[in-house]
Amino acid sequence: MTMPKIMILPDKYPCSITSILITSRCRVTMYNRKNTLYFNQNNPNNHMYSPNQTFNEIHWTSQDLIDTIQNFLQHLGVIEDIYTIYILVS
């Protein structure tokens, strides 16, 4: 099984996440500032993000963003290649 395809738009760093759109043939889910993006897992470089820390308040580098999004997707159970993930950043 391969991981979902992840697209970052626009491709610029450092960045803040504006929205995450998860799509498949029968499902579309969007996470944005209105339904705030919470993530309470450890990221690979051992920085802990508080459950109240929103994605859009963190300035991401390229690899940190990819690693954290993959952990977030695993947390949601989105681990199959039937999904395409669009990360909108500013």
Curated annotation (Swiss-Prot):
GO terms for cellular component: host cell cytoplasm. It comes from the Viruses. It is found in: Host cytoplasm. Pfam families: Pneumo_M2. Keywords: Host cytoplasm, Viral RNA replication. Mediates the regulatory switch from transcription to RNA replication. Acts late in infection by inhibiting viral transcription and up-regulating RNA replication. Inhibition of transcription by protein M2-2 requires phosphorylation of the phosphoprotein. Belongs to the orthopneumovirus M2-2 protein family. This is Protein M2-2. It comes from Human respiratory syncytial virus.
